[in-house]
Design a protein with these regions (language model features):
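Secreted glycan hydrolases and related glycan-binding modules that recognize and/or cleave
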Residues: 26-86, 91-114, 118, 124-137, ...
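Hydrophobic helical h-region of N-terminal Sec-dependent signal peptides
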Residues: 11-19
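Bacterial N-terminal signal peptides that target proteins for export
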Residues: 1-11
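C-terminal motif of bacterial Sec signal peptides marking the signal peptidase cleavage site
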Residues: 20-24
């Protein structure tokens, strides 16, 4: 190897490269040219956002079971301030029009004189913190209507000069308030574990919810699902649609007889949705398809005065990917449907059965799953798990059909922070065994489950004596 020639070659190459580098720098650098700083905008800003302090949600549904409801409003910052900084929160009545327009809702403003903020709404974020909270109290009033949703838009105001508010969404959080004082037969305490029940309505009357009563008069099932309507393809319209079989449609058409008596006692009634052996499916809608289908679900809930929906991804065929309403089956598509459903009906429950592709994606468009999934229930013999910022309070810890609500199971639910237990397809013909499997109710609620005395036959609102009239 000739070291002399290699060294000479390297030196020549370095001279050429340095010349090229200096020429490039000279070409790029223009002294006195204004620099576009847009790429750096925001990096020094301290952006604020508003949340409900208890739930950390932007949109919080509040049910008034007593004369007052207490929570906190939290202002968070994107970074720790150099010195203490402050802002105020207040009711922004004008924002409600914007909110209603965005969600196609018609919520009325909650009476402002029934809402108070501690410390005149002032929040102070200390130099070693990134958030602050202020107490908020919502009082009940005599003029409130039952079964109506009111809105309280809360906004940041009078912020210090070092606080930036990026947009209207960051500036606001909203409380959707329902007066439940006259519909409290399911209310067993704010932190009580709740019951979630599927009714096979092809065979069983949902009024049988009323058979399950504690000795203290409370009903154990807080939410029931009409199982199930279907998602099907409408060939004339060229899009997915809701399809109700005659049994489901009968209950919807006669909801004042079979559903509203439950709702007036505090039971939430949901429409169950299930695939039905064609090209559509709950986890295979395109973004636009999900938005359109969610709007139809919202229309059903409004027309028949229902409390929300349960989605179950089963029994769908592979989609036609040439159809603009459909896409490849995925958990992302299922999450999009849940997200769009919550946008279309923010005061209703959006719940999922964690099966197939229905559950698993934690964010849609940067919005956490805790904002658009209210409850997740598991398959038989398993427990649901939270995703994103969800907690076990939004999850069922057991699923009927594979598990019983025994005293030890009830203690496990409470000790592990689960918010729900799930039951499936009760029939009066099986009440003896069903009630024996619910003896953990006393552990949960401090009151034993009464033996059944009444039941309801299909499509008949008459209470019959159990077991004599079976």
């Amino acid at each position: 190897m000739n070291i002399k020639y290699i060294t000479s070659g390297l030196l020549a190459a370095m001279i050429v490269n340095c010349t090229a580098f200096l020429t490039s720098c000279a070409d790029d650098l223009e002294v006195g040219k204004n620099i576009d700083e847009s790429a750096y905008s925001g990096i020094y800003e301290n952006n604020a956002y508003l949340r409900d302090g208890k739930s950390n949600l932007v949109s919080k549904v509040v049910e008034l079971h007593g004369e007052t409801y207490a929570t906190t409003v939290k202002m968070g910052l994107s970074k720790t301030p150099n010195t203490a900084t402050s802002a105020k929160v207040k009711i922004d009545a004008a924002y409600l029009e914007t909110y209603n327009k965005a969600h196609n809702t018609d919520f009325e403003l909650y009476p402002q004189d029934l809402v108070t903020f501690a410390n005149e709404g002032v929040l102070t974020v200390n130099a070693n913190a990134k958030s602050a909270e202020v107490d908020m109290t919502i009082r009940a009033g005599e003029g409130l209507q039952d079964d109506k949703t009111y809105a309280i838009p809360v906004a940041i105001s009078d912020q210090s000069s070092d606080i930036t508010i990026k947009d209207e969404s960051a500036k606001h959080c909203i409380y959707l308030v329902k007066d439940m004082r006259n519909a409290g037969d399911t209310y067993k305490g704010e932190d009580a574990v709740k019951g979630y029940l599927f009714f096979e309505v092809n065979d069983v009357n949902p009024l049988n919810t009323l058979s399950f009563q504690l000795e203290n008069g409370k009903l154990i099932w807080d939410v029931i699902v009409l199982f199930a309507a279907n998602i099907n393809y409408d060939s004339e319209a060229g899009r997915p649609r809701v399809q109700c079989n005659p049994n489901v449609q009968y209950l919807l058409d006669n909801n004042e007889t079979f559903l509203q008596p439950l709702r007036r006692r505090g039971v939430k009634v949901l429409l169950g949705l299930l695939g039905n052996h064609d090209i559509t499916g709950l986890a295979q809608l395109s973004d636009q398809g999900a938005k359109d289908f969610a709007r139809e679900i919202a229309q059903y809930c409004k027309a028949y005065n229902l409390d929300g929906v349960n989605y179950d991804d089963e029994y769908s065929n592979y989609p036609d990917l040439n159809n603009p309403s459909l896409t490849t089956p995925s958990t992302a598509a299922a999450a999009r449907l849940c997200y769009e459903s919550k946008l279309a009906m923010p005061d209703k429950l959006v719940t999922v059965f964690a099966y197939g592709q229905m559950y698993g994606v934690a964010t849609v468009d940067g919005v956490d799953a805790s904002e658009w999934i209210d409850i997740v229930v598991p398959n038989y013999g398993s427990s649901a798990y939270p995703i994103g910022n969800m907690t076990k309070k939004q999850c069922a810890g057991i699923a009927g059909g594979g598990s019983s609500l025994t005293p030890s199971t009830a203690r496990s639910l409470m000790n592990n922070g689960y918010g729900w237990y799930m039951g499936f397809a009760p029939s009066p013909d099986n009440y003896y065994s069903i009630f024996r499997r619910l003896d953990g109710a006393e552990t949960l609620y401090g009151s034993p489950l009464k033996d059944p005395t009444v039941f309801y036959k299909k499509n008949d609102p008459t209470p019959y004596q159990y077991p004599d009239d079976l």
